[in-house]
Each structure stands twice: as structure tokens, then as C-alpha cells.
Amino acid sequence: MPMLLLPFTPRYIALTLAWVLTFAFAALIETAMISRWDIPMGLAFFACLFLGLLGIRDLIQTKHSVLRTYPIAAHLRFLLEHIRPEMRQYFFESETDGLPFSRTQRAIVYQRAKMQLDKRPFGTQLDTDKLGFEWLRHSMAPADVSAEPFRIVVGGPTCKQPYSASVFNISAMSFGSLSANAIRALNTGAKLGGFAHDTGEGGYSPYHKEGGGDIIWELGSGYFGCRRPDGGFDADKFAAAAVNPQIKMIEIKLSQGAKPGHGGVLPGAKVTAEIAAIRGIPEGKDCLSPARHGAFSTPRELCGFIAKLRELSGGKPVGFKLCIGQPWEFLGVAKAMLETGVYPDFIVVDGKEGGTGAAPLEFADHIGAPLREGLVFVRDVLNGIGAKDRVKVGCSGKIITAFDMAVAFALGADWCNSARGFMFSLGCIQSLSCHTDRCPTGVATQDSARSRALVVEDKTTRVYNFHHAMLHSLAEITAAAGLAHPNHCLLYTSPSPRD
């Protein structure tokens, strides 16, 4: 008897109802109580039949327990789970609690990229009593706002081609991770604004060349662009490419904040024939960059590699990027600098907040030092060995406003890079689908049907506008503090103003 009643229990009621309606509509049509050509009734019959068959499938499949227990009805759970991020982003999250970037942070980039009003009435929405609230102190006698954008000269005594860099540049994002149109827009915007574009470890592509903007060539452990068939470093290929006048600096990637110690991954879905040809890798297969370099393995060898790249490139600035991990390892690099007399022209500190590379959850959340801790450590070590003046320090990691830049300068940076900030200027909506090749705005995809949504001419202007507005805001902050340059800024943090 219980088995006979099973179809009428609440968890099976959707399946039972679907089949009851299916037979009812079939009977009505068969007995000619309605016209056999009644389209709405026919559609209703087929809809109920589909749901009934779907329910049978749910009962016999073995992958999802919840579907076996609640046939048909459980699909509603999967639907709600699928649209949950969009519902949260558009309807439920506040202006300040969205992650990785809040609505306020995203909006300021959109507004500045479009040259729209970026002011806000009625005061701050931040909790000024919250533990760790930060601010910069202004002056009773503000300075004049600098008419010239802030720049920094990168290149030590042994550098023959020092580079005058903007203090705000595009951080490392590879062609392959980003679409061709995104690379075109970023690099052309960099050309218009006079700032640099880091290639990411994917290397220098034809789309970087099209824009004509200044290039920082990032050299990862995969050595893309100067790679031997066995995956090793090819000095001849590097020398032939590095003399390109568009390439202004060479950056050795030791690790990245999104996944330090894990290496790089470009999903096979994004490895098109074009990318495979540029990088020298198999088409359609995951492109894996080793977690460590093969051209060197010790701090002394790293210094030797820096000297070698500087010579092969004709004396261009050469440095390295890393996310700080074991402090003693970086101290070992500093010791090697002193012993060999070979110093990098720059060091880029990548905070673990970095996020344009897809990463395992544990690495994204818990591996590597955050930007501020890493930046302060590198600054102190360079000061300790007397090298801070000759080795410039760049930084990257969730830098999205001029205040973020001022904080970085206060902690020892000479310039800042931003990746996701410039992605927002291209139209990124933080859909968190970068690794799926299904980016809805055409920024992080190799699907030509999707990337065509990104109109290069329009987004080029927005990239330029965002950079220009950021530097202007930084100049205003610097002037309000009564300073001539943001590297004199001081950051203040208090547990509570009432303490």
C-alpha cells in the first residue's frame, strides 16, 4: 500500500502531476473534444510530456541524489544556484560589501572611464569607527595640483636605456587570457596616455604591436616568445625580440599573487591555433607554465640571468616580479645582489590579492603575502642593503582608486600597476567567468563571437580616460596633503577614533 501512495507524496508530486496532465491533454485531443490543431493545447501536451520524461530521467540517473529524491522539482534548485551570483550582485549586495570588488569600486572605474560625474553626495558610506579604518592627513596649506603627470625613471647605473614610466600602468595580463580586442584597446589606450602595458607571461603578441604602446615584456617560466622546443630559454630568440623599440623593460616573473608557487595555467579552451603558434605549444591543450624557472635555480644564478638579459636586450631595464613568501628567500636574493654587484633595475611586488589568473581556492585565499605586508618587507630589505634608490619598486594587487595608489606610495612603492581596474574600464562586469571562455563582455575570452562585443575604438578611449582620471585624482590627493610627490604620503590607521 505505501508503494501505491508513493507517487502522491510531496517529493514526487511534480512528476505525478506532469504525467497526469500529459494523459489528460492526450485524451482531450484523441477524443476530439478540442481541435487537433489547437496550437496552445498541443504545446501544453508536449511541455507536460517533456517534464514527465525529465522526471523519469531524474529517477534513474545516478549523478545527483537530490534529483532522484525530488524529480523535476529539484531542477529549481540548480536554476536558483545558477542565477544566485547575478541576483546577489544586482539586487542584494550593498554598495560596499561586494567581492572581490564592491559596487562602489566598480562604479568609480566605470564613471571615470566614461568621463561621467564621479562625485558622491551626503558623505562617506564607510564605517569610520571600524577596526583598521585608514586615512591620509591633509594640510592646512595645500600645494598646487601638479599639471604634469607623475613619472619615475627606471634604470640603474648599468642600464643603458632607462625608461621614464608613468606611476600607473597596466598590470600583467596575457593575450590568451584576454581577447585580441581587449589587448588592442589596452595597448592603444596606453599609447594615447603615455603609460606602459605589461604583456603577462603569454608574451608579446601581434595585438600588442598594433597598438604601439610601451611594453613591459614579462618573461615567465614558460619563456613564451623566446622558448626552445624543449621549453627552455632561447637566448638568441630573446635577443632578436628584445631589441624591439616598443619593448621598454623586461620583467622576470618569479611568482604571481593569484597563485604563488603554483605556476601559470591557460585553459585548453583558450589555446587557439593562433595562441599555440605565438607560444609554441599544442593547440587545444592546457598551457602549463612550471612553478619555477629552468634558466636559474639560486639567487646568484638569478642575478646572473638578470645581467644576461640586460646585455642581450641592449641595456634595457631588467627586473623581476614576485609575491613574497618565505622571507629568508628574498633575503638570500638581497645577499646575492651585494655579493655579485648585480642589481635588478626594479622589483614588482605582487600582492596575493591579485586575481586575473585562475587559481585553486586554497592558493587564491591562503598562499602568499598580501600586498601591503610584502611591499613593506621589500622596502625595508632594500633600505637595509642601501639599494632602495637604485632599485625601483612597483606593486600590484587590487589597486583601483587614487587612494589605493597613495597608500602604496606611503608604504614604499615607486609606481603602481592595475589589472582588474583596466579590465573594468574595458567593460568587465565581474561575472567571475574569466576561466570559462564565456566572458559576457568580450574581455577575457577567445570566442570570436563574444570578443566582437568589445569595440576597440570605444574602449581605447575609456582606458585612456581611466588612467588620466586616476593620475589627476592622485595629484589632487597629493596637493591636499601639501606634498609635491605622492611618495611622501603618510598612511594613518586607527583601531577607533575613540581609543
Regions found by a protein language model. Name each.
Residues 288-451:
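Glycine-rich phosphate/ribose-binding loops and adjacent secondary-structure elements
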Residues 49-62, 81:
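Transmembrane alpha-helices and immediately adjacent membrane-cytoplasm interface residues
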Residues 147-149, 153-336, 343:
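Active-site-facing alpha/beta catalytic cores
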Residues 2-18:
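Juxtamembrane interface helix immediately N-terminal to a transmembrane segment
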Residues 35-47:
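Hydrophobic alpha-helical transmembrane segments
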Residues 492-499:
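Conserved small/polar residues in nucleotide/adenosyl-binding loops
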Residues 427-490:
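Active-site or pore-adjacent capping/gating segments
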Residues 74-155:
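An N-cap/entry alpha-helix motif that binds or orients negatively charged groups
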